[in-house]
């Protein structure tokens, strides 16, 4: 029977509690149970006067509001303040009464500019959330993946000027110069005067600078959009996809440049370096490979395809003999090491007399040259070791897991938490946005882990579910003890062929297996080769 709707019901009085209006399974209830936010008060109390002035708004309340904005992808603080006054669940999470108004959007802006501008509060909050993740066993610390993503700055790409910027020497330049001097000493050549390597006071390169946001960088890369951007270099742990480090640079800085700093930040946050790190092909660099080897980290780096488009033979047609340190041309003639350049490349030259009558001379080098030259970086051996490992079955498994960790983390941040665009001007505000976004994503990992444990403990009382859960956990334990996992069937460890004597020695450690990616069950992987193993021709 159709009933008429009573009018004026909005004007009736009811006795209700805010606690009753928020569903038990609401996301914010889970966040409240999983995360302890009380540390924010201790973190910020020194920024407030203890005995003078008007009573301030609790800093924990302000940052809880910011967390709501990042968690639900609310980019505008005006919109966020409006949502707090209209959304009952938001009021409950902030500890407000039903009729109490939340802080104004200008209050958040004023505190950011006047109180939280120069003390890295956002980074400290991220560190504390990460500490809670580590404390609850969500971070393995063995296998990490690092990558970068571009974030559109609040700057018009047409409003720019050009300035001359002095080139900053790379962190590894001193070590590279020492290796170059050793090379030249072996060849009986005079060492370079490396003081000439320092950029002159008036030197440098022309660089586009935005007149709106001078701290961002113009991005000019193949396959990337043109304009002014920032780059976030993010490192995630493979166990539960927890973000363990965030580093922000202008987009005109090469991805390779901040890697030494990133490794130091990871060591400071975790207390140790990982056993292996995965990178995409943008980090395919001999200096990075040497840095990883020096820190005893097994790298897994995407392989770059040969892109030689010239009319003469590319370097990939020449085979390198590790035992004799020579290159072999397609006609089976040797190219010998003759010198090392100031940039750190060893130059290998062929015999001009043999090249003179070679049937492939015109295909190998130009008519103005008398012999062929091939360059090899002084740290190329370290990069070759990584290339060899990445091509193995276990290396491919490690590399394939990269897109399910770091790529998924970036996709989540951009699609759900507003990281596609910078919210404010300046690299300091960009760092705050990246750190708080990463902190919110780690909070979601904490919530997921906590309520998975609660689910397993509650369903243990149901016989059928209890049996299934017990079988699932037993399978987890078997895999963590080192059982091998293939695409279809588990394989017993004793059935795996061990390395022959004299070959590359290896150790085994479990990594996440893509077959069980939904719950991060580990599978086996071949770790780094023994460092004492001699080089052999690939």
Where are the predicted features?
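Hydrophobic alpha-helical membrane-insertion signals
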Residues: 1-29
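Anion-binding and metal-coordination hotspots
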Residues: 4, 73-86, 96-529, 535-538
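Generic alpha-helical segment signature
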Residues: 11, 24, 37, 58, ...
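A general alpha-helix detector
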Residues: 17, 61-67, 107, 128
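Short secondary-structure boundary/capping segments within folded domains
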Residues: 19-21, 54, 224
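Basic, short loop/linker segments at the boundary and entry of helix-turn-helix/winged-helix-like folds
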Residues: 24-67
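Glycine-rich, N-terminal phosphate-binding loop and its surrounding beta-alpha-beta segment
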Residues: 61, 67-71, 75-78
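Short amphipathic alpha-helical interface patches used for protein-protein assembly/oligomerization
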Residues: 90-94
